[in-house]
Amino acid sequence: VNTDGAEPLIRLFHVSKQYTRDQRALDDVTLEIARGELVFLTGPSGAGKSTLLRLLFAAEAPTHGQIVIAGRNIHRMRQSGIPLLRRNIGVVFQDFKLLANRTVWDNVAFAMEVVGHPPREIRRRVGIVLRQVGLADKVHTFPDRLSGGEQQRVAIARALVNEPAILLADEPTGNLDPALTFEIMNLLVDVNIRGTTVLVATHDPRLLEAFPRRCIALRDGRITEDGA
């Protein structure tokens, strides 16, 4: 929780998301996340974790309420401002979403190419993040030759290459065995220590026990618990 008096990086005010009249994925959610926090979003399947992350990424808009990131109300922004917002938010999914016909290097570089970075800067940043995630020796490897843990590390490198202030990880260890689960979580902790604000959606109790951090529990779209 924010204790230094600085403005929270992420603020939600009475946010609800309703897909149908009977289906409310989020119900009156209010919370603040400080710059530099690592926060777990927990709860059973269907609790609203993924919906919350999609709203933060502006992939969807809330039915009610306001979302403010770095002082900007993201759903009052012009449509032209959304790509700039997303450039400041990295996203990691459970199923990696790697390009099968591209090498590790190309998968990570692509995230910089699409926003127009010059080749020299792309080479510099891709090299840095692949070393950070421990894949400097796999740059020419294709995804189908990687383990599940290595594929997830590529996905994390891709999410970090544009130096986002926020990393959203949606069940990032959901498809991994226990040893790889802790390997990926240690990497996310390292990312957080380097200054990135990290939100991890998970229903894996082992992570919560092994990495005691602030935990926001959701059930039926409502926050039921918020604390360490």
Regions found by a protein language model. Give the residues of each.
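Conserved catalytic motifs of ABC-family nucleotide-binding domains
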Residues: 163
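Short coil-to-helix segment of the ABC ATPase nucleotide-binding domain corresponding to the Q-loop/switch region
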Residues: 102-110
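ABC ATPase NBD coupling module
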Residues: 20, 74-90, 119, 191-193
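Catalytic Walker B motif of ABC-type/P-loop ATPase nucleotide-binding domains
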Residues: 167-170
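Helix-to-loop junction immediately C-terminal to a conserved catalytic motif
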Residues: 57
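Conserved ABC transporter NBD signature motif
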Residues: 65-73
